[in-house]
Amino acid sequence: MGQAKKVSSALSKLFVYGALKYGQPSNSILASSGNGFAKFWCKATTTQKLPLVIATRYNIPFLLNKPGVGYYVTGEIYEVDDRMLNSLDNLEDCEEIYTREMHDMNIGVGEGTVPCWVYLLQKYPENLLSLRYLSSYENSTTHPYIMRHRRTHKHPAQDDLTYEAQN
């Protein structure tokens, strides 16, 4: 009798802080099994202060890689498989806009920290640091998040993230 092939089912932890959170516009991506596996694990907070801002004409929440600035950011941890991570890397334009890095997240008083993947904006115009910092993201009518399929191809989000000095 042959052995059944062992499927690698190692799951990673992913911290989400913006439109991917439960009840937010892009959470359906995590909920779709066509993108891979994702399961809510717990609520969490960053272990260091980071600036969370809403920017671009599409009101995208960005977590800037600028430790010590901003607030401790509240979000959610999901257990995800490699297929989901690849789907999210494509969604988040990994390498073009975001980078995915491993950071420790607080999971509660007395509970400690857990290492999680998180999407951070590495390169950004300095004017993003002058925007209002948030400790938690919620889609709103004052800054309505524009889903990717509703954005115009003439103006990709990265066009709003110019790195040159503005006159």
Curated annotation (Swiss-Prot):
Q: Say which domain of life the source belongs to.
A: Eukaryota
Among the Pfam families in the record, one is: GGACT
Coiled-coil parts of chain: none
Q: Which residues bind substrate?
A: 17-20
Q: Which gene encodes it?
A: Tina-1
Q: In which tissues is it expressed?
A: In embryos, expression is seen in heart cells of the dorsal vessel and hindgut visceral mesoderm.
- Entry's EC annotation: 2.3.2.-
Q: What species is given as this protein's source?
A: Drosophila melanogaster (Fruit fly)
State the protein's purpose. Answer: Putative gamma-glutamylcyclotransferase.
A single GO cellular-component term on record: cytosol
Q: Report the protein name in the record.
A: Troponin C-akin-1 protein
